[in-house]
Every structure is written in structure tokens, then in C-alpha cells.
Amino acid sequence: MKIHVLGSSAGGGFPQWNCNCPNCAAYRQGSPHLLERTQSSIAISGDDANWVLFNASPDILQQIKSFAKFQPNPVQALRDTAIRAIFLIDAQIDHTTGLYMLREHRQPLELWCHALVHDDLVTGNPVLNVLAHYCGIHWHDVPLTQSGFAMDGVPGLHFTALPLISNAPPYSPHRDQPQPGDNVGVTVVDTQSGKTLFYAPGLGEMEAHVWAAMQAADCVLVDGTLWTDDEMITLGASGKTSRAMGHLPQSGAGGMLEWLDQLPSSTRKILIHINNTNPLLDASSPQRHELTRRGIEVSYDGMDIDL
């Protein structure tokens, strides 16, 4: 299984266009310890030729330009792409706006998402209605069953979606009232090697079924949004805690680091969806050194993971 990190930042990217937090300010002043990051998205393939795009960020065009395997093959059709399917884990703006940029597709987009996500994308944020006037979509409802599913045109991979406690977008009727399917994590299994990835960029609470999936995975690529629960409040950037926004903080009791420390030593542990305010973005910070000590990696745009 090939996994390519297209974007590693939370919504807004890094640096965020209107932000003067210590990280964004230091980046603009030329700090060598901070990398530019686009908004969260990954690509997965079982054969290195047919790919699934997980989430379509507002930065999708830049991400495609940076990833040759997503670019049109000159020996194929005039209009070509290796993206065989798109999987949306939720209906958030930073995971769906990129769909507009894919409207030139020659056939309907093969779109996989839960019915609740689909509902939000034809009502509160009706991007799918707009796309009906362009390429259109072929929607596949993502089941929340242990048996999982395969995708046509994506050989060698099997997918299982797990409901997560996180938060729906502000335009959803389920905002602050989580419903199973608003947000999902995904287990992806390479059917030849048996290797398993668990992917959950938005994880607000650790439940038994989620923890079991993480323990069974060879690699976990999980929520790294904020370092402390009150990070945004302390900076004056928001009045909400990390958990209230649907993200487990890294530090503190019951935080992501405590959970990752309990995984088998053989498990590869990687953080993604990192907010611009998070001090771990600074490679010279005590927080980054703490992650290194614990054997936890920080994803970056262009990172490749082989399982």
C-alpha cells in the first residue's frame, strides 16, 4: 500500500492567511524550523497506479501539481487522472471545497461518503448540487459495518469506516450533536500484504471500537490538531477548547499522546491535520522534541508511507 500525504495542516493551512500567532509570524520572518503546509488530504493506492483521494481540500490544485502520479498520463486520454475515487470523511469546508476544482472531470466523480455527509453537501453546503451542472457525481453510501467494502477501479485495498465522536460543520443540523457518520475514521487493508492503516484526522474522543482499530493497525495517521485543550483560548484565537471543536488535544490527561504511548512498539505513529497555532510545527520546539522522544512522527506535505 502506498500512502502519500498531500496536505498535513488543519483548515486554513500554514501559515494561515490572516494569522499572526507565534508560528505564522516566525514563518514569515524566515524561520528555518517551520515548513509551509497545505490543508489536510492524503492519497492511497494498492498498486501505485489507481488512487483514492481522501478529502478534497481547497489546496487540491497545488497538491496535484506537487504529486506527479495525480497528473495526466501523456500516453492516455487527452483528459486523464489516476484518481479513481474520492472518500470524504466529513463535510467540513477544508475537506470538500476542492471538489469544485475537479469539475472538469470527464465522467461523474466516484464519491464515497456517509449519508449524513451527503445530506450536508446537498443542503447546508450544496457543492454536490453545483457539480451536477458540471461533471456530476456518482455517490456511494459508506456503510458503518465491520465487513467493510471495496471500491471498483481500486484493486488491492479493502476499506472499513468507523463512526467517530467529533463535530459536524457549522452549517450542519448536527452541529454540537454528533451523529454516527458525521465523521468517520477509516481502516485500509492491503489485501496482499495484510498491512493496515488507520486514518482519523478528526478524532474528538477515544471510543472502544476506535481504540481496537488503532491497536490492530500497522500505522496510525491521526489527529494532531492542537497541543493543549485551551490552546486557541489562550492565544485569543477562539473561545472554544480543542475537544469542543471535535479534536483530542495532544497533551494532558486522556490526550492523544497518552493513547499513542500505549500502542505496540511496532506501530508507526504519525500526526496529521495540525493547526497553525500548534507549537509542534516548530521543529526546534520542546513539543517536537517530546514527540521524537516518544517515537511519534509529524507528517508533512509530500510525505510517502509504504505499508
Q: Locations of the language-model features?
A:
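Short, well-ordered alpha-helix to beta-strand connector turns
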Residues: 83, 108-109, 134, 216-218, ...
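Active-site neighborhood of phospho(di)ester-bond hydrolases with catalytic His/Asp-centered motifs
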Residues: 53-57, 82-94, 113-114, 198-203, ...
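A short, active-site helix/loop in glycosyltransferases that binds the activated sugar's phosphate group
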Residues: 116-126
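A short alpha->loop->secondary-structure connector
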Residues: 71-81, 105-107, 127-141, 148
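Extreme N-terminal starter segment of soluble prokaryotic enzymes
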Residues: 1-4
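Cap/insert and terminal regions of metallo-dependent hydrolase folds
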Residues: 181-183, 192-196, 204-302
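Pre-active-site segment of Zn-dependent metallo-hydrolases
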Residues: 15-91, 97-104, 206-213
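Active-site-proximal loop/helix segment associated with metal-binding centers of metalloenzymes
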Residues: 12-39, 143-242
